[in-house]
Amino acid sequence: MPLIKIDDKEIEVEKGITVLQAAIDERIEIPYYCYHPALSIVGSCRMCLVEIEGMPKLQVSCNTTIGELPPERKKDGKYDMIVRTQTEIVKRERENVLEFLLLNHPLDCPVCDQAGECYLQDYSYKYGRAHSRFLEEKRVRKNEYLGSNVIINHNRCIMCTRCVRFTREISGTNELFVQARGDVSKISIFEDKSLDNMLAGNVIDICPVGALLSTDYIHKNRFWNLEAKKSICTDCSVGCNILVYSQNNRIYRLNARENHNVNGYFICDIGRYGFHRYEDAEKVTSPLIRSDGGFKPISWEGALKEIYEQFSMSMSGEKQQIVGIASPFHTNESLFMFGRLMNNIFKDKSIIGKLPFIEDYEIHFDSGFRISKDRSPNRKGLLDFCPNLEDEILQKVKAGEVRLCYALDDGVDRKLDEEWESFFKSQRFLVVQTYAMTPLAKLAHLILLGPSPMEREGTMTNDQGRIQWLNPSVSLTNKTRPDWEIIMEFMNTVGKRELKYTSVNEVNLEMGERFPDYRGRTFFKIGYQGLPKKNITTSRPSEGRQAIQ
Amino acid sequence: MAQNRTFKFTNPQRVEKILSQYPDKRSATLPLLHLAQEQEGYLTSAAIEAVAELVEIHPGEMMDTVSFYTMFYTKPMGKNHVQVCQTLSCSLNGADSLVDHISEKYKIAHGDVSQDGKISLVKVECLGSCDTAPVIRINDSNYESMTVEKFDKIVESI
Amino acid sequence: MASFEPILTRHIHREDSHTLSGYKNVGGYKALEKMFKTMAPDEVIEEVNASNLRGRGGAGFPTGVKWGFIPKDSHKPTYLICNADESEPGTFKDRLLLNKTPHMMLEGMIISSYAIDCHLAFIYIRGEFYQEHKILEKAVEEAYATNLLGNDILGSGFDLEVVIHRGAGAYICGEEMGLIESLEGKRGWPRIKPPFPAIEGYLRCPTIVSNVETLACLPHILNRGADWFKSIGSEKGSGPKLYCISGRVNNPGVYEEPLGILLTDLIFKRGGGLIDGRELKAVFPGGSSSAILRADEIDGLRMDFDSLSAAKTMLGSAGIIVMDETVDMVSVCLNIARFYAHESCGQCTPCREGTTWLVKILNRIYQGNGSLNDIDMIFEITDNIGGLIDFSKGSFGKTICPFGEAVAWPIRSFVEKFKDEFIAYVAKGVEVS
């Protein structure tokens, strides 16, 4: 392996990587604009110039690969390359490039959405010159729509072409191009062929300056007001890693978060703008009980009392059937608890089912990015923790028997067809755990208020078997209780258990005890990048049932 | 901009010949654009899309190429498209007064087409005929050692 | 001046010099026959290496050495591209060859292709060269008809297809990586090196890009031998060279002379001196991308790669533009700056932004609104676009392609060498206001 020196730091690097990659890995800052690890190298911004011993001129570090020198040609007797990133000439060069970039820039940071997370700002602050020498008139152009959700401010654009390369190399949709040449060149679209693809929003994320703007977020908030939470997307079973930006419990925007085992650097627009669905939904704000054809609020104590009255009867031998409807939208911890409730408390009186999976087109991009046809986040977890799931629950449920039903609601995406509607209507008592007045909630006798997907916490298992942490991006509102806790109370009430988990982590630990595939998959272990399941057991129903019992 | 909605090459054999000359389709871009422009005088959106389809790229990528080159026009030029070289050797030998003359006579500036559509004017960079400066180009022919008088005569004759 | 017998242009005055028969009548395609009969590809490379032929496009890189960069173990096809995208201001030598003796270049292409094992070659001809394109098309047609191109050329077993490819108006496509991108159907944004074209060029295959004049030298080298070629000119650069003379001279035109001829001989003997007997003020020795020379700097200066770089300028394309005492250097500098701003491809930050900035400042000075500070600024900006120029160590370019240097050198040299004229403009502005 080549041994190089960047400034004072000796580094052993993999042969063939670039100086910039080596520096990034070592957290040595070399400023850059046009380089992006997921895109081809163009070397045009000229910001990442460094001094390399033995080379007559400065080199762009993004396109300088590190090789091995024969022993007699090693620098200082041992190095394959000596790189300097802090010399006077390098500093002057950065200053010069920044001066060029700012010549025609409007310097309108006070009204720019990128302010606070702008590489033009940051590098100017760090490496730029303090005053402008440009006495001429600036080049001024109007903003334009590139697509339904993306606006370009040409005046702030530095022509790094990351966005153009993104549409060619990642989305493969090719909408963006460079129009004309020289200093009149600009990013453009061809007539009505606008930037409207499933990955379009990523160009806003990868734009290093405030040129590409989201119509969804424009002028809504300032970056420094926002709190960023590392979480995962719940809009399909890929489980892309995201950053959720919020202030005062309101979500403002979602960005992609890097995870090379899942989504690389990007997310799709379904996930990016999906959080609005929860804002638009008719929210449930308290546990509710049916009353005079409508609902009225009920306290948690009242709700549990109601559950006790309805369900504990079933424990006393009366021939009843308990139907549990589990959901692939819920966390592993909730599903684990749900499985315990059904299998350990109601035992053979219970039957667990689910509504049909919500599916849509599977979308594959040549770059490897994928949107799953399974538009629920945790089908794998559902199958792991409710291994005795009945596929044909509508047929299996015996006619004529008294039926009690406890359903974890899929949420706002769930629609009910007539068959399912009449199934739920035929229940003697229907408890629905949800956050919104969904079609299913409307049929309930009792609504238990659980968190929305942005409030949930716990693990999800994506379709590759990777266990990832769903981090709540906003905190729970007053009367909402975590799903696992509600189920725990259900167990304590009906099954006379004395479970006292105080956090989702405790449930997670217990879950690991009983399901070896999930052992040690605690938040502490999996962190923000997730870990694969252990695959100690396969989730065959029989084994699964043993694990529960 | 009124543009033809459809475009069809009138010489499909020529198109086939061009495509067959290159190891990949996209390399045929420039010759196909030249051919389309010869046919219609300029590159309509439909023509750009047609060429893009032939070489199997997105029309946006095709526009990326088209807009880079000064010899491709995306709007109609005059019947006689006058290109005056303004680079050094021509400038040293009187190119500026030629531009002034044409601008005044036809009431057009750089990039304009005269009202009757007969003359359009662009200032261009070095045409590689510096020994016979100043040089102008009308459509595809160069006219060398130009003077204002010579220019007027040439325009009359074509 | 020692007598020199023109080689490349010897027969161009003949009416049929551009036809196949015309070319054959004066010994054309004899080198090809000789090569196929007596030489292996490696021997051709050796001969060209021995001839010390350096590229005539501007950079002056040794042709044989360039050929040697092609990977020996590559399974990809090798391509040859003839660079006929002549667009350097003040340069019109390739155009002459294309017009008058296209077969000489074609013969050179076949020789070069044979040497590098290329079976598909391109001629990238400047879009504006319409007549030349027609002539070239005819020449290629004739060559195919007589089995000088196509399969099994002259029974040698060697196959070669030649495709003429027209550019569409972009100076930067004369740069080899810009040219390759353009040939691929893209905008002519020069691709970053490495990899170099000899390793990954056209369609990421090994590619050699050679200038028209360079290729036209090849038949003569094979015909008369490397030693003969080397004997022409000086140690520092051998062979015949086409010089273009334009601007304020009595006899502008292309003149063939050995490398290393005196610049003064070119201007005053070949070029016939200055119009109306005026005084010489300044001259571009190698197209507008070379640093300008003042009249007092040219005495004894020889036109070859090394002598000119010692004089802090370059041979470039050998486009000599002559300016007399009446020429306003501020306006010429503005003219040149405009050219580069118009032709900057816009890819690299310093070139895209800097060229237009220079035009704006120069225009302001020209309009009488400049200040002395502006003059210093021009120095700094040219340095920031093109790099600090140290001729002992080579150029310090700061952009992907040498365009940045091509802007910086001339603009800087104008302000450096004719500073008094710039100051006068500033002073005039001060007076007016």
Predicted segment positions?
Chain B
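Signature of N-terminal electron-transfer/Fe-S-associated modules in redox systems
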Residues: 1-158
